[in-house]
């Protein structure tokens, strides 16, 4: 059974995706099809959870839109993802940041920033 799963995952086209960790602020460009038109829609928020591995990996991204919390579960290997950009690297001490759901206002998106050294 494991060999079958590995075989299927090997044939999946992988999207170039940076390392995403809980606490990171990301902007994801998604392809949205409305009728016959296709456009890009940006979803920017904090990664509060990641789940799974390989082709079935998903992340949960949360943002505040007009005072209302919006969460979206996004499969990392989805063909509808155009690009993923990490805006800030957050320093989280938990693997799931569900406690951000209880916070309101700016505190709902506040995660300490992590310094990342970029090597050329």
Curated annotation (Swiss-Prot):
One of its GO terms (molecular function) is structural constituent of ribosome. GO terms for biological process: translation. It comes from the Bacteria. InterPro entries: Ribosomal_bL19, Ribosomal_bL19_CS, Ribosomal_bL19_sf, Translation_prot_SH3-like_sf. The keyword Ribonucleoprotein applies. Keywords: Ribonucleoprotein, Ribosomal protein. NCBIfam families: rplS_bact (TIGR01024). This protein is located at the 30S-50S ribosomal subunit interface and may play a role in the structure and function of the aminoacyl-tRNA binding site. Belongs to the bacterial ribosomal protein bL19 family. This is Large ribosomal subunit protein bL19. It comes from Chlorobium luteolum (strain DSM 273 / BCRC 81028 / 2530). The gene is rplS.
């Amino acid at each position: 059974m494991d060999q079958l799963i590995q075989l299927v995952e090997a044939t999946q086209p992988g999207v170039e995706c940076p390392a995403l960790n809980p606490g990171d602020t990301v902007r994801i460009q998604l392809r949205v099809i409305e009728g016959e038109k296709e456009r890009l829609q940006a979803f920017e928020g904090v990664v509060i959870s990641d789940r799974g591995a390989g082709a079935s990996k998903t992340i949960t991204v949360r943002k505040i839109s007009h005072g209302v919390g919006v969460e979206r579960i996004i499969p990392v290997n989805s063909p509808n993802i155009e690009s993923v950009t990490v805006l800030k690297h957050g320093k989280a001490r938990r693997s799931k940041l569900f406690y951000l759901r209880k916070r309101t206002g700016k505190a709902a998106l506040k995660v300490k920033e992590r310094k990342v050294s970029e090597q050329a």
